[in-house]
Amino acid sequence: MATLFIADLHLCVEEPAITAGFLRFLAGEARKADALYILGDLFEAWIGDDDPNPLHHQMAAAIKAVSDSGVPCYFIHGNRDFLLGKRFARESGMTLLPEEKVLELYGRRVLIMHGDTLCTDDAGYQAFRAKVHKPWLQTLFLALPLFVRKRIAARMRANSKEANSSKSLAIMDVNQNAVVSAMEKHQVQWLIHGHTHRPAVHELIANQQTAFRVVLGAWHTEGSMVKVTADDVELIHFPF
């Protein structure tokens, strides 16, 4: 058996091939797992659990079917879907996790997260993140009419795209000191995260020993998952 990790699907109605690929994954590989962890940015945008978008209901039903089959499903918020709430979690059968979670997997101590908090060189993004994660601001936003939230979200995505176009790739990647600090804080040898869309397995030193950072890929033209078993930790890419 294996525990599976995925992230950065950025599901939206404009990308039906990714949706179809995810549905096949849920109906196939996911059903064989000990557990499924989704490490953020499952959706391209999330403006509230009350959004009647048919895609959201379709995904909730598909994930719920995996959960009902006996495979526990867990979710860590990403920077795109940090407003995903308890209602959708209940409808999909997912358990919401904190932004950093330590797992004991087949004798390994593994830290999981979305990964955006590691990009500390991007001061502009970190300031924005701190602002939009304020509970009072989220409550205020979610109280707005749906059409207003849609307009605000569209403007924010446009602003983000424009800002990122002028940033260096190095700034938008993780900060090595932040990585080591997180791993040493939690006393782990393994870290699995997404966000950067740069799939790789990195070897480093943390806690005075060899450690590993595994970065999930985004689902653009193919699927990406990390498969953890008693024998191995694999970063796997597969066709939709």
From Swiss-Prot:
Catalyzed reactions per annotation: UDP-2-N,3-O-bis[(3R)-3-hydroxytetradecanoyl]-alpha-D-glucosamine + H2O = 2-N,3-O-bis[(3R)-3-hydroxytetradecanoyl]-alpha-D-glucosaminyl 1-phosphate + UMP + 2 H(+)
Entry keyword Ribonucleoprotein: no
UniProt cross-references to InterPro entries, sorted A to Z: Calcineurin-like_PHP_ApaH, LpxH-like, Metallo-depent_PP-like, UDP-diacylglucosamine_Hdrlase
Ligand binding (Mn(2+) 1): D8, H10, D41, H197
Residue numbers binding Mn(2+) 2: D41, N79, H114, H195
Cofactor: Mn(2+)
Primary location recorded for the protein, binned into one broad class: membrane
Record pathway: Glycolipid biosynthesis; lipid IV(A) biosynthesis; lipid IV(A) from (3R)-3-hydroxytetradecanoyl-[acyl-carrier-protein] and UDP-N-acetyl-alpha-D-glucosamine: step 4/6
Matches recorded under Gene3D superfamilies: 3.60.21.10
EC number(s) reported in the record: 3.6.1.54
Gene Ontology molecular function, alphabetical: manganese ion binding; UDP-2,3-diacylglucosamine hydrolase activity
Xref: Pfam families: Metallophos
Cofactor note: Binds 2 Mn(2+) ions per subunit in a binuclear metal center.
Protein name: UDP-2,3-diacylglucosamine hydrolase
